[in-house]
């Protein structure tokens, strides 16, 4: 799995994805989320893999254990590099996800979403009825994730240092909410720059609109890549 900034391909069609990818002449690490996968499906996965790119298939599975296990069996056949579930689904569901994935793929990494980077502490308490700090909630979910046998979590860069200290540096910490200095915050709440994310212990960063909506996506990508890789 490449140690590159993961580009969130938040497009609604395969045509727009291919137009975007045609601008690059190097292997990338890209994220395909629900919006795109539900429109374009497995055929797009195969097309992107044929270009030599790594893929994070970001579907955030969250259902009863049996359903997630069977769904993950299907994802295991797609030869993607990274998949995920919601940690809120519980330990049994996460263990089932690992079983399903490993039935067809031992190479694909699997991680769990702790708290979305759009979540604030006020939302955590008033809407999710979780009466702890975000850091405590994320650490609890991440600990359960590690105990269930997953490879890491999706978390804010702001929690990455805590998770490294508690769960070790080999536990993946994939961090959205990355914005270069001066970029628009959009709907993210808990954000940092690429440089700060690395210093805080993130193992991978996810960047979308600052690259995909840039006037010069290739230049923006390389700027972020240089900031991330140092």
Curated annotation (Swiss-Prot):
Keywords: Decarboxylase, Lyase, Pyrimidine biosynthesis
Residues the record lists as binding substrate: 10, 31, 58-67, 117, 179, 188, 208-209
Family label: Belongs to the OMP decarboxylase family. Type 1 subfamily.
EC number: 4.1.1.23
GO molecular function, one term: orotidine-5'-phosphate decarboxylase activity
Protein name, per record: Orotidine 5'-phosphate decarboxylase
Self-association state and partner proteins as the record states: Homodimer.
Leading EC class: lyase
InterPro entries per the UniProt record, alphabetical: Aldolase_TIM, OMPdecase, OMPdecase_AS, OMPdecase_bac, OMPdeCOase_dom, RibuloseP-bd_barrel
PROSITE patterns: OMPDECASE
Record pathway: Pyrimidine metabolism; UMP biosynthesis via de novo pathway; UMP from orotate: step 2/2
Signal peptide interval: none
């Amino acid at each position: 799995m490449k140690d590159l900034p993961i580009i969130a391909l938040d497009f609604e069609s395969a045509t727009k994805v291919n137009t975007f990818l045609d601008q690059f002449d190097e292997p990338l690490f890209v994220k395909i989320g629900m919006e795109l996968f539900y429109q374009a499906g497995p055929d797009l996965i195969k097309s992107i893999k044929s270009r030599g790119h790594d893929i994070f298939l970001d579907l955030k599975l969250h259902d009863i254990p049996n359903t997630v296990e069977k769904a993950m069996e299907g994802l295991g056949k797609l030869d993607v590099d990274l998949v995920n579930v919601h940690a809120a689904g519980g330990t049994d569901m996460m263990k089932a996800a690992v079983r399903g994935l490993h039935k067809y793929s031992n190479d694909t990494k699997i991680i769990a979403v702790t708290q979305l980077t759009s979540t604030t502490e006020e939302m955590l308490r008033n809407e999710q009825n979780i009466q702890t700090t975000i850091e405590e909630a994320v650490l609890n979910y991440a600990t359960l994730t590690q105990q269930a046998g997953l490879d890491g979590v999706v978390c804010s860069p702001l929690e990455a240092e805590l998770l490294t200290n508690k769960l070790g540096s080999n536990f993946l910490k994939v961090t959205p909410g990355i914005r270069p200095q001066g970029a628009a915050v959009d709907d993210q709440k808990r954000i940092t720059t690429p440089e700060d994310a690395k210093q805080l212990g993130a193992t991978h960063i996810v960047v979308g609109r600052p690259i995909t909506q840039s006037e010069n996506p290739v230049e923006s990508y390389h700027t972020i890549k240089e900031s991330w890789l140092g």
